[in-house]
Structures are given as structure tokens and as C-alpha cells.
């Protein structure tokens, strides 16, 4: 909701997003803020049931969540900030169960950031023409000349983080065997078939990351 409020004027100028509730005026900014405050209250009530370390770390995610929508105005790396924010739950889940932070969740978290960086770059290519006109920045624009190399790099870092996590957790060979499935999917299906000039193809491949 915060993202839609922040991007209201931008969304009006982009064909794909102009019908979003706040951009189209179906929901007012005031009502959007009420929804946001309500959701934050419920989230806080849930959070207070966890240990102190989890609560402190969770509160640290708030500045990330509220500053992310502004990043596309100032940097070509808003997708990186999305990854940092979106995957924060990996850290929280570990701390909630173990009551401390460790190397393993940090490695997994770092890898997941690059996964998000990759698939949201694909997502961004849907609007790249409109974004360039209105002045929005993104990794899609920054790497538009050779996006596949960038995506391969992001996904390689992600898969490497999973392998490293498996080694540190002493997983058996089945983990690495099943890891071939997402590896094949990311490299041979997503990146290989990615057509950054076709918005429908971009959205189709982006959605494949829900596996």
C-alpha cells in the first residue's frame, strides 16, 4: 500500500499500472493510510508474541519497508532494496526459532536477495519504455543491453548460497539432487527463454518464480 501511495503519480503514467486502486482513485490516499496503520497494528500484535531478539530485528525492517518505494527515484538498484526487504523474513524465521543470529541464515538471506534481484529485473522489463520516459530507474534499465548475463550472475549467486547452506547444514545427497530442479528451471527455462522485448513473456517468466 505504501508503495502504491508513493508511486501514485508514476502509476498513472504507466499503461500496466494506471488502473491500480490508488492510482485510479478507486481508493483514496487517506483510506490507504488507514489500511496501512491497521495492518501495522495487527503485525505488531503478532510480533509481540515472539522473543525479544526477534522483535528487535523485526522492527529494523520497518525503515526498509517504508523507504523501498522511494529508491526508484534515486538509484538504478531498487530491485536490490526490494530483495533486502522482501527476504527479511528468512532472518526473522531463524532468530524466532533459535533465539540468535548465525552464519547460515545470513548466507541464505544474501542468496535470496539475488534471486529477487533477478526475477524483479525481469518484471521491470514490462514497463521499461514508460519508465525511461517518466524518469524511473531500475536494474532493467541499467542492464538493458545485456540482461541475460546479469540474470545468470544473480541466479548463480543464489544457487551457490543454497549449496553453501546445504554444506553447512550437512545435508545429504538428496538435497543436491533436488536442487537440480530449481537450477535447471532458473537457467535453462527462465533466462534462456527470456525475451526482454516482449512484456507478456517477461510477466510469464516472472510468474514462474512462484514455484
Question: Language model features by range: what are they?
Answer:
Residues 8-58, 133-176, 180:
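Multi-pass membrane catalytic core of lipid/isoprenoid biosynthesis enzymes
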